[in-house]
Amino acid sequence: MKMKKIIIIYLCFLGTIMANDNKKAVFAAGCFWGVESTFQQLDGVNSTTVGYTGGKVKNPSYELVCTGLTGHAEAVEVEYNPSVISFSELVDVFFKLHDPTTMNRQGPDIGTQYRSAAYFSNEDEKGIIEEKINNLNESGDFTSRVVTEVEPVENFYDAEDYHQDYYKKRGIDGCAI
């Protein structure tokens, strides 16, 4: 019986340690509903949160962000397990799910809140993003240069509850961004 308790305690402790190995990444690529849906489908992504980042106003609302006056972008915070999916792989997905050459626009959505931006937590992540941008610019895949902003992660404000898991709640697989 004592051994069972030790094993249970060990497993709980191990689960806590493993959970703490998760990392977060933040991406802005147009309307956050579709971006969130894409990242949710990846193995190694544990959770996503849609929200606002890159602006001047604390705790902005969707309505305020949509005015374009706050400087925020609609963004997705991705919590992931780096032993399953790397930051580099997340950046690859980010660049494939939107057009990184359009300034402040994705599809029919126009405004600074729909800009392309990838956020980094350290110099290694910054280097990964910049290398991928350079590779895209040299690839000839686009007729215009990549305009994705590369910025440090600062304040990320969760969007309102009705925006979280938007497509999941409605039984929609995703959208063509």
Which residues are covered by each model-predicted region?
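Flexible coil/turn and secondary-structure edge motifs
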Residues: 18-177
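Positively charged n-region of N-terminal signal peptides that target proteins for export
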Residues: 1-6
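Hydrophobic h-region of N-terminal signal peptides that target proteins for export
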Residues: 7-19
